[in-house]
């Protein structure tokens, strides 16, 4: 027999008001996330860093980490950046980094859509009608002239012998006109 009495441990006896703070593991995960964010910031150019909402001390610590060449010194400086990140607006910084990453994807997708539209315009006259319906203020004569010139250029390029450089001037001009329409 044991000399001390034990109360049964059950949910009815559990008082969670003492444990309203995050667990130690959760705090460590958050600190590692801030450290990783700090590592990302160290990889940015000074121009990009200036666009972020960083305190002067954090900015200088990041610049110092960028200048540090020794492996251990750089690691320690990055950890210092991670420590300073605790008081930084991490969500605003993450949002800006995501915008930079995904913005370029969106731009690339828009360029691909314009290239596909250009190809449709060169192959099918009905595609021009669709473009004009979406952009009623477009200069019809200018677009038709660009399409004719690009088609003529493509026909001339098809007749080139091996090794000759194809002309792409009208092809690019049509793309620029479509890009200006979408802007």
From Swiss-Prot:
Gene Ontology CC annotations of this record: cytosol
Region (Disordered): 1-27
Keywords: Cytoplasm, Ribosome biogenesis, RNA-binding, rRNA-binding
The organism's place on the tree of life at top rank: Bacteria
Biased composition (Acidic residues): 9-18
Keyword Flavoprotein: no
One Pfam family it belongs to: DarP
GO biological process, one term: assembly of large subunit precursor of preribosome
TM region(s), chain numbering: none
Function: Member of a network of 50S ribosomal subunit biogenesis factors which assembles along the 30S-50S interface, preventing incorrect 23S rRNA structures from forming. Promotes peptidyl transferase center (PTC) maturation.
Name under which the protein is recorded: Dual-action ribosomal maturation protein DarP
Organism: Bordetella parapertussis (strain 12822 / ATCC BAA-587 / NCTC 13253)
Gene designation: darP
């Amino acid at each position: 027999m044991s000399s001390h009495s034990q109360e049964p441990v059950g949910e009815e006896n559990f008082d969670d008001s003492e444990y309203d703070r995050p667990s130690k593991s959760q705090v460590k995960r958050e600190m590692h996330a801030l450290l990783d964010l700090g590592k990302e910031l160290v990889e940015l150019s000074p121009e990009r860093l200036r666009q972020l909402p960083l305190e002067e001390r954090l900015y200088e610590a990041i610049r110092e980490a960028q200048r540090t060449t020794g492996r251990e010194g750089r690691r320690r400086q990055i950890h210092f950046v991670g420590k300073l990140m605790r008081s930084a607006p991490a969500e605003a910084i993450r949002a800006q980094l995501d915008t930079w990453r995904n913005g370029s994807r969106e731009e690339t997708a828009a360029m691909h859509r314009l290239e596909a539209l250009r190809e449709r315009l060169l192959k099918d006259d009905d595609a021009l009608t669709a473009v004009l319906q979406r952009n009623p203020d477009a200069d019809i004569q200018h677009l038709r002239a660009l399409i004719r010139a690009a088609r003529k250029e493509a026909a001339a390029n098809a007749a080139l012998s091996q090794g000759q450089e194809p002309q792409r001037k009208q092809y690019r001009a049509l793309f620029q006109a479509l890009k200006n329409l979408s802007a």
